Amino acid sequence: MGRDIGWADTVRFRLPPGWAVDVEEHEGQPVGTFRPPPPAAGVLRLVTDRVVPRPDGGSPVADTLQEIALRFVRPQDPRAGDRTVDSRPDGAVIAQAMMRTDEDGRAETHYLWLVGAVRAGAAAVAMFSFALPALMDGDESCAETLGRIDDAIRTAEIL
């Protein structure tokens, strides 16, 4: 069945069963980390943010949210692909992309999601990244894991 995870008073989602939950710190910001049960590979990371448009900017919060989603899919980055930005029936925005990286000799594939909505005059966003070794990308167990994560993220509730 999984377990409900709430993060930073911004997002709630259902983590698949058996996943380990931890917190890392990156540049002074807490990062939720979630690891699938063995033998599955990879790590899901989560950060959140709330962006209030500048009062003198004149653009509505919904425009700010759309701009964040479009920047999230990295249109200028040649490493990114499979970019989409969609709206859910509840008004939330979902942006998705995939990126291949090579850091310190480690080839990795990163699946990226942003779920955001207008909440209390701000653009509230949850940004998820699932990283796995590139050689595991396409493996049947990884495809199953990705399917579960995708379902959980697409149905995440922005608070």
Predicted regions and their residues:
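Short hydrophobic/glycine-rich mini-motifs in sensory/regulatory modules
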Residues: 120-127
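Signature of long, low-cysteine stretches enriched in small and polar/charged residues
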Residues: 66-120
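Short amphipathic beta-strand/extended segments with alternating polar/hydrophobic composition
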Residues: 44-47, 110-114, 128
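Structural motif
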Residues: 11-14, 120, 144, 148
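Surface-exposed amphipathic alpha-helical segments
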Residues: 127-159
